[in-house]
C-alpha cells in the first residue's frame, strides 16, 4: 500500500487496528516462548528465510543463493514452504520442476526448477518436514518464509529487506507493512538488504540479470540485443523489475503490474505485445509456460551477496555459524 511509505492520515485511522494486531501477535509469540503452546523441533537444522514486512523484498533469490552455497559446501538441502497461492487439494505436496504452479505455487516451483532440490509445501510445516525427510536425504532444511510461524522451532533466522523501502512507516499491519515491530530484528541472525545498504544491513544483495530466455523455445539472448518491448510483473515490487530493464537500455513501450502471485490467462497478455517482445520475471514465467507465444521472454536473476561494509566480516561469521550448526546435529 502506498500510504505505508508516507505520512498519510490513513495511518492514524488504522493505528487502533495495528495495536490490536500487535497485541495478538505478541501474545501468540509469548505462548510459544513460554511453552504454553507446543512447537515442533525438526531432526535436522532449520534455517528460516523470511521478511519483517509484506511484499517484494527479494526472498526467493536469497533462498536460491543460500541453497547453491550450501550445496557447494557438500550439504544436501531441502526446502519447505507455506506454498502461498497454491490451490492443491491435498497437503503436504512434494513439488518438482514439472508441478503445475497452480497446485504447487509459483515460488516453490521456481525454486525446484532453479535448484533441482526437494521442495515440499504445506500450511503445516511439521507435515512438510516429515514428508521431505521421508522422500529425500537432507543435511539441512530451509524454510521459505515462516519467520512468524512459531509452531516451527528454528536454528537460524535470515531476514530479507528492501533497502529503499526498509520498514516503511514503522507500523504493523494494517497501518503499516510490518508483521512484527522493528525491534524483532535484534533477535534475528542475519539481515540481507536488497538493492543497497541501510542501518540494518549485515550483507547487501544485488540482483544480476544475465540474459533473456524464450518461454516457448528456451532460446537464450543477451539483453543488449533488445532495444524495446513491453514488460509485465506479478511480484511484490513490480517497479523494481521495470527499472532493471530500463537500466539495461531496453525502452519499455508499456508496463503492466499485476498482483503478487497472479495466476495468468493467455487472454490477459496476448494483446499487450503482439508485435514486440514481452518481458516477464522468472516467477511469472513458470505460470505462463503452457500458453506462451513466440515473443515472450523471461529474465532470470542471480543474487550476489556481499558485505555491507568492507571492514566487516559478517559473511564469514554467518557461514561459521552454519558449519557449527550442522556439526552439532551430526554429533547428536
Curated annotation (Swiss-Prot):
Question: Pathway it belongs to?
Answer: Glycolipid biosynthesis; lipid IV(A) biosynthesis; lipid IV(A) from (3R)-3-hydroxytetradecanoyl-[acyl-carrier-protein] and UDP-N-acetyl-alpha-D-glucosamine: step 6/6
EC number(s) per UniProt? Answer: 2.7.1.130
Catalysed conversion reaction: a lipid A disaccharide + ATP = a lipid IVA + ADP + H(+)
Q: Which GO terms describe its biological process?
A: lipid A biosynthetic process; lipopolysaccharide core region biosynthetic process
Q: Name one GO cellular component term.
A: plasma membrane
Lineage: superkingdom? Bacteria
Q: Which GO terms describe its molecular function?
A: ATP binding; tetraacyldisaccharide 4'-kinase activity
Residues bound to ATP are 53-60
User: What top-tier enzyme class does this entry carry?
Assistant: transferase
Q: Which UniProt keywords apply?
A: ATP-binding, Kinase, Lipid A biosynthesis, Lipid biosynthesis, Lipid metabolism, Nucleotide-binding, Transferase
- Which InterPro entries does this entry report, sorted A to Z? LpxK, P-loop_NTPase
User: Is ATP-binding among the key words of this record?
Assistant: yes
The answer to whether keyword Transmembrane applies is no
UniProt-listed HAMAP family: LpxK
Query: What does it do?
Result: Transfers the gamma-phosphate of ATP to the 4'-position of a tetraacyldisaccharide 1-phosphate intermediate (termed DS-1-P) to form tetraacyldisaccharide 1,4'-bis-phosphate (lipid IVA).
- This chain belongs to which protein, by name? Tetraacyldisaccharide 4'-kinase
Which organism encodes this protein?
Haemophilus influenzae (strain ATCC 51907 / DSM 11121 / KW20 / Rd)
Gene this protein is translated from:
lpxK
Amino acid at each position: 500500500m502506498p500510504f505505508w511509505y508516507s505520512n498519510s492520515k490513513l495511518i492514524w485511522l488504522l493505528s487502533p487496528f495495528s495495536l490490536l494486531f500487535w497485541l495478538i501477535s505478541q501474545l501468540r509469540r509469548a505462548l510459544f516462548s513460554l511453552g504454553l503452546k507446543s512447537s515442533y523441533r525438526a531432526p535436522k537444522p532449520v534455517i528460516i528465510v523470511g521478511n519483517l514486512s509484506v511484499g517484494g523484498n527479494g526472498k526467493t533469490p536469497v533462498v536460491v543463493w543460500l541453497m547453491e552455497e550450501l550445496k557447494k559446501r557438500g550439504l544436501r538441502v531441502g526446502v519447505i514452504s507455506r506454498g502461498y497461492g497454491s490451490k492443491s487439494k491435498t497437503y503436504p505436496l512434494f513439488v518438482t520442476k514439472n508441478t503445475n504452479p497452480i497446485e504447487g505455487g509459483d515460488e516453490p516451483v521456481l525454486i525446484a526448477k532453479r535448484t533441482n532440490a526437494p521442495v515440499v509445501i504445506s500450511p503445516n510445516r511439521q507435515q512438510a518436514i516429515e514428508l521431505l525427510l521421508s522422500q529425500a536425504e537432507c543435511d539441512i532444511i530451509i524454510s521459505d518464509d515462516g519467520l512468524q510461524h512459531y509452531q516451527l522451532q528454528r536454528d537460524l533466522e535470515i531476514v530479507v529487506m528492501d533497502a529503499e523501502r526498509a520498514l516503511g512507516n514503522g507500523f504493523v499491519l494494517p497501518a503499516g507493512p510490518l508483521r512484527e515491530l522493528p525491534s524483532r530484528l535484534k533477535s534475528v541472525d542475519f539481515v540481507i538488504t536488497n538493492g543497497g545498504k541501510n542501518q540494518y544491513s549485515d550483507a547487501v544483495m544485488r540482483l544480476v540479470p544475465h540474459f533473456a530466455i524464450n518461454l516457448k523455445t528456451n532460446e537464450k539472448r543477451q539483453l543488449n540485443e533488445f532495444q524495446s518491448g513491453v514488460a509485465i510483473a506479478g511480484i511484490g515490487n513490480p517497479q523494481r523489475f521495470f527499472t532493471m530493464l530500463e537500466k539495461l537500455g531496453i525502452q519499455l513501450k508499456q508496463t503492466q503490474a499485476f498482483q503478487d502471485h497472479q495466476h495468468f490467462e493467455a487472454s490477459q497478455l496476448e494483446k499487450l505485445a503482439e508485435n514486440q517482445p514481452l518481458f516477464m520475471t522468472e516467477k511469472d514465467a513458470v505460470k505462463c509456460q503452457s500458453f506462451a507465444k513466440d515473443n515472450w521472454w523471461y529474465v532470470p536473476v542471480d543474487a550476489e551477496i556481499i558485505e555491507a561494509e568492507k571492514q566487516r566480516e559478517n559473511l564469514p561469521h554467518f557461514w561459521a555459524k552454519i558449519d557449527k550448526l550442522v556439526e552439532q546435529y551430526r554429533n547428536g
